[in-house]
Structures are given as structure tokens and as C-alpha cells.
Amino acid sequence: MVSPDLIRNMVGIVGNIISFGLFLSPVPTFYRIIKNKDVQDFKADPYLATLLNCMLWVFYGLPIVHPNSILVVTINGIGLVIEAVYLTIFFLFSDKKNKKKMGVVLATEALFMAAVVLGVLLGAHTHQRRSLIVGILCVIFGTIMYSSPLTIMSQVVKTKSVEYMPLLLSVVSFLNGLCWTSYALIRLDIFITIPNGLGVLFALMQLILYAIYYRTIPKKQDKNLELPTVAPVAKDTSIVTPVSKDDDVDGGNASHVTINITIEL
């Protein structure tokens, strides 16, 4: 009989693979930034939030906090490195204002993590208490990260278009949340279950919206609009032209002559 721990590890490995794919999903965005040498209208906020989320989960999965969670450490450790690379690229091609903002946020996150690590290690002396404190923080920040697609979903409902909600990303997000929720339920880890369970719910909502609106993507309006045609109308216009006294018009003297012109409109 297959042991629950073996099944849990297998599910965790699959979860690592799927999560790795999710971490790599912004690569085209950063390729564009490097190519243009400008961050344009892209924001660093999602990557700063994900960086903090990864740091918390790495700390949570360490044996000194929550034993037997090495797979949580591996994928979030990889995610931490990837997010650091993204933020380095973003920093290099940002203006001074964005660089200053990023510096402040990164410093705040570093101080926050230092406070959490010191507070937990010095103030909590059992795995249960340490898991509780760090786990609650992971749930809070993980929920914020997973709820970010709500903005996109509201846009889909308003515009009735799934143009800015890629199907592949929604499917992978659903599978990722489902995988890690299953992993957490095998040995009931409520702190992994809650944010990933919400991730499954939000991804499922995206898939439902896609099924509803994928046929109703609004077509772009044709710039070459056909103007309404007007039938030509004949109109007589009289023009009065002065005539010199020396000129003879029909054998008589005249100071003006009237010319009829027909204009087609």
C-alpha cells in the first residue's frame, strides 16, 4: 500500500513543476522591457508582493518552523530567485522615481522579514507556535496575491471580453492551486490549504467567465468607415458679372450681364 507521505511528496513535486511555470510566465513582459530599455506602464508592485510572499513561505517551510515541508522551501526558494531577477531588470530600466519607490518597498520588506524571523525564533520556542505565527502571515499575504485576478475579472464582465485574461494562465493557476490544496490536505496543513483553496476558487471563476465571454470578444471597429452617400442634385446658380461700357451685349449697352450656371452637388 502506498503511504500518504509518498503520495504527498509526489503531489508536491508536481506542484513544484507547475509553480515553476507560473513563476516564468512574466518572462515575455521582461523581454519586452529589455528590448525597449524602458518599463513603460508596467508596475513593479506584483513582483514586490510575490517576493515577500516567497520569503514568508521559505521561512515557514524551514525545519525550525514547520518540519517536513521541504517542497514548500524548494519552489518558493526558486521563486524568490526569479522574482529577484525580475526586480533587478525592472530597477535597471526604471526612472528615478520608480527606483526610489522600489528601494523604499524593498527596504521595508527586508526590515519586516528580519522582525518576523527574530520575533519568531526568539519569542516562540515550539514548532506549533512558530508555525501558527508564520502561517497566519503566509495566509494573509498569499490571499492578497491570489485575489489579484479579481481586478481582471471585473474588467472581463464590464467589457464582455477575455482579451486580457489568457486562458492558459487561468488553467495553470487552477491546476497549481488544486495541486497544492491536495498536498496540504493529505497531512492537513490549514495554512497552505486556505490561500491555495482560494486560488482554486478564483481560477475556477476565471474559467467560468472565459466560457461565458470567449465568443463575445468585441471586434475592433474598422477605421475606414463608409460615409453615407448623397444623390447629386442639380442647382441653377446665377452669377452677375460687370460689363464694360465699351462692350456690346446683344447690340445694346449694358452695365451687367447675368450668366446661368448649373452646378451638380
Curated annotation (Swiss-Prot):
UniProt record similarity statement: Belongs to the SWEET sugar transporter family.
Residues covered by the MtN3/slv domain: 10-97, 133-215
Residue spans crossing the bilayer: 10-30, 46-66, 70-90, 102-122, 132-152, 166-186, 190-210
Subunit and partners: Forms homooligomers and/or heterooligomers.
InterPro entries membership: SWEET, SWEET_rpt
GO molecular-function terms, A-Z: sugar transmembrane transporter activity
Disulfide bonds: none
Full protein name: Bidirectional sugar transporter SWEET7b
GO cellular component, one term: membrane
Membrane-related topology note: Multi-pass membrane protein
Subcellular location as annotated: Cell membrane
The keyword Electron transport appears for this protein: no
Protein role: Mediates both low-affinity uptake and efflux of sugar across the plasma membrane.
Keywords in alphabetical order: Cell membrane, Membrane, Repeat, Sugar transport, Transmembrane, Transmembrane helix, Transport
Gene3D superfamilies given in the database record: 1.20.1280.290
Entry keyword annotation includes Transferase: no
Domain of life according to the entry: Eukaryota
Topological domains, Extracellular: 1-9, 67-69, 123-131, 187-189
Residues in the Cytoplasmic compartment per record: 31-45, 91-101, 153-165, 211-265
Biological process, per Gene Ontology: carbohydrate transport
